[in-house]
Every structure is written in C-alpha cells, then in structure tokens.
Amino acid sequence: MALLTPQGVKEVFQLQRPQGRERLRRLLNWEEFDEQRDSRRSILLDTLYESIIFAVGKGFPWVEVAQVVKFTEELLRETKGCSITEAVTILGNKLRDYRGHFNTTHLLALCDYFHHTFIRHYKLYQYVLGQDQQVDLTVAHLEVCMPPHPLPLAEGMDRDLWIHEQQVATLTEAEAQKRADVLLLKEALRLERENSLQKAFAAAAPAQPGQVLERQELESLICQAVHTQMELLQELLQRQIQNTFAILDLKLQKKTLNLNAPTPIPPPITSHAGQEEALKPQRASKGKKAKARK
C-alpha cells in the first residue's frame, strides 16, 4: 500500500464521502474498479475510509491519522485466513509495535475501535475479504418518470363531480360523432347515386352519334334511374332514423346524468362579509326564539 501523507488524509476527510473515497483510492494508487461487481475492494476501501473518520473524530493529529490507515491495512492483510484467537493476538502485537507512533490515550482508543468493529464482526470480515466470491450480478437501468406537478388545490374539484363531467363529455362527443356520421352518409350516397346513374346512361347511350333512343329504351332508362334513386333514398332514410334514435338515446342519458349530478362543495368562507352572510340565518332564528319566549 502506498504510504499516505498527513496532507493526503486531511484532503480525504475534508471532502464529502463519495469524493473522499475516490480521493483515497487515488492516494492508494488503486486502479478504478466497479463498485457493484468488485464488492471486496469496495468494502476494503470503506474500511480504510472509516478508519480515517474514526481517527479524526478522536482528535488524532494528521500524522497519526495516516498511521491509523497503515495500521488498518496491515491488520486486515496479516489476519487473512486466521482464527479469531490468532486475530486477537495479532492485534495485540501490532498495538505494541505502534506504541512509538501513538500516545497511550490514542493507543487505547485504537484498541477499543478494532475490538468493537473488526473483532466483533471478524467472521464477516473473513468471509468478505478472505475468500474468493462468485459474483452473479444483474444490473438494470430504469428510467423513473416523475409525476406531473399537481394543480393548485383551489383549482381542484370534487371527485364525484369530476367523474360526472367526464361522463357528460363522453356522451356529448358520441352525439357529435353520430351527427357527423349522418353527413358523411349523405355525401357517400350522393356520390354512389351519381356513379350509378352515369353508368346507366352510358350503357343506354346509342351506338351511333345522333341516333335517337326508342320509347321503350327511354322508359327503361327512366325506370332504372328512379329505382336507383329510390333504393338510395330508402337506405338514407333508414340510416337517418337509426342515427336519430341513437342521438335521442344519448340526449336522454345526458339528461339523466344532469338530474343526478353531485352537488358541488361550496368554497370556504374566509372574508368578514361572507361570515356575516353565513351568520344571518342563525341570528334571525335566535331573534324569533326570543320573541316567542316573550
């Protein structure tokens, strides 16, 4: 591990946690790694970073803070694969070795820190840092869409009233569509009539220019034109009647909805004049009761 300087650990501490961890990684000369896939290195970096936070919190000088990081890294490396009894022995030996770097108070604080963190959770540290782990990680990137900003409460309405207005709007739209269907049907039948008559006239036209149609042929052509006109008119009337009944049914539904419309909630009375208006019926009632008693 690269030897940290007092200035280096000071820079790490003064940064926010994410930036501080990144600065510590650079000072340790570690290569960049995937925090999610390389959990071992991520936890090791967390442990070293937390040792800096602990030392500064206990008032260690910056020189001793750098030594605490070195102490932590050596302890984790030397206890790899050891039993907890061996780990306690190694911790005691290292504390004695570092007596020249820390005063008695800081040495006791360091001993207490590792007993309550490293030794207490020793099996977990060994499992994470001492064994190769097979990582099977699936990463999914989700796009979170924020809900739209709600309108001011004063512009809102009662839920039942809103549902009623939506139902009325749906019926109104359906009625308008029915009326549009009638206009489209008239136009379609008109075009069909013109096309049918044009075909009939073209078929009955004389072969030679200037040739006059016989009376029988002319009567047949007129009958055919009248028959075509009557068929299309009958279809138009039938469709119009159907649409008229459908429109009347929609109007009846709207009328029924409006008769059963929910009563809107009146706005709260906030002004002095409004409060006076609201109190008038109560005052009148009290006056009548007083007169009755007399």
UniProtKB/Swiss-Prot annotation:
Ranges of compositional bias, category Basic residues: 283-294
Region (Disordered): 259-294
Pfam families registered for this protein in UniProt: CLAMP (PF14769)
Protein name, as recorded: Uncharacterized protein C8orf74
Name of the gene encoding the protein in the UniProt record: C8orf74
